[in-house]
Amino acid sequence: PVTAYLRSDSTPDDGLELELVYVENALPANLLGVEGKAVLVNGRFGFEAYGRIQKAKPAAIIGFTGNILDKDDETDHGICKIRETYTAEFGDNILVNLKAKDALEIVSKGAKKVKLFVSSTATESESRNVCVTLRGTDLADEIVSFGAHYDSVLFSTGAYDNMSGSVIIMELLRYFVANPPRRTLKFNWFGS
């Protein structure tokens, strides 16, 4: 099983059967001859790698998240998103994500073809940040900033990524409200 990237293109209703090519870290030499095929990339890919991949014109891109030691009953399929900055620069594609151990099995067994079914609808939503400033006493022009994101990270339970960071800076804020700081402190919770 796979999950589609948020903002992925859709396949036709009857799916898309493609030749599969493992392109490792998507270096230029690995991307030769992949036009019209599905490419399996090591892990997730950044802006530059996405650009290289798109330049090679594959019909679909497959990445993976997690670790080969992840236990099925303790982890979800990672939900990934292709950022607008990527697609604005390099275009859209069909993008899916699978678990690392499934990617290992696909490569180990020498899979040659994949059939993908992706139904995706683009939506826009708004995210908000929460910012609190505590003005310092005698060194108010010096600023110390704390930040954490409070959006959902679906691959984890949220306790570590990043609820713990959000709670820690909330407790720091509580402390410094009761004990005014010498320097100005900024506390920032980011929605995404």
Can you say where each PLM-predicted feature lies in the sequence?
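Noncatalytic luminal/extracellular "stalk/propeptide" segments of secretory-pathway proteins
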Residues: 1-38
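Short beta-strand-to-loop junctions in surface cap/lid or active-site-entrance loops
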Residues: 10, 26-28, 131-140
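Alpha-helical metal-binding/catalytic segments enriched in His/Glu/Asp
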Residues: 43, 130, 142, 146-192
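Intrinsic low-complexity, polar/charged intrinsically disordered segments
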Residues: 101-103, 169
